Design a protein with these regions (language model features):
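Cell wall/extracellular polymer interaction/catalysis modules
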Residues: 1-78
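Exported/periplasmic cell-wall-interacting domains
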Residues: 23, 28-46, 76-85, 92-161
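General beta-strand recognition
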Residues: 57-59, 87, 118
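Generic alpha-helical secondary structure signal
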Residues: 63-65, 90, 116
């Protein structure tokens, strides 16, 4: 099980970043396929993060409008990313993650949404667009920061196959 004690950020002390409507969706890096149509959010108002495992991509929606997107690396076959609907329940600027076969100090911009499953920055690989993790949603650090600053505790996280 991952350990998580470090710098917790309370929702009221977080800086909110509102992205612009133009250019907010980041293009995939060279050689990576661009999804043909972004997935629809679950509906309703407010903010939602949608993780699409077969695309290895994460989407940010606000009031049903796509505002940002990034490539990701999710769980490998042995440690799959859990599918379902969850809510971010705690955020850390940096945290220690460890388990069988890994010890990762200072994992940046970590947002836990289900037990030990989290969306976070990744400094130990840059192989985004392919499953690489022990179940978490790995993002490039700059992208993780964007999601971290945009999504408060309580944000809906939908993980789809």
């Amino acid at each position: 099980m991952r350990q998580a004690v470090r710098q917790a950020i309370e929702p009221e002390s977080m800086r909110l970043v509102i992205p612009s409507q133009s250019g907010a969706v980041s293009p995939p890096p060279a050689g990576q396929p661009k999804p043909s149509v972004p997935p629809a959010p679950s509906g309703g108002t407010g903010k939602e993060i949608v993780v699409v495992l077969h695309e290895q991509r994460v989407y940010a929606y606000e009031n049903g409008q796509l505002v940002h997107s990034s490539l990701a690396s999710t769980g490998i076959a042995r440690y799959p990313t859990r599918v379902g609907q969850f809510r971010i329940y705690v955020k850390y600027l940096a945290t220690l993650m460890s388990g069988p076969g890994y010890y990762l100090p200072n994992v940046p911009y970590t947002m836990y949404y289900s037990g030990g499953y989290a969306i976070h920055g990744t400094y130990w690989h840059s192989n985004f667009g392919r499953p690489m993790s022990h179940g978490c949603v790995n993002l490039p650090t700059a992208e993780a920061r964007w999601f971290y600053e945009w999504a408060p505790v309580g944000t809906l996280v939908t993980v789809r196959a």
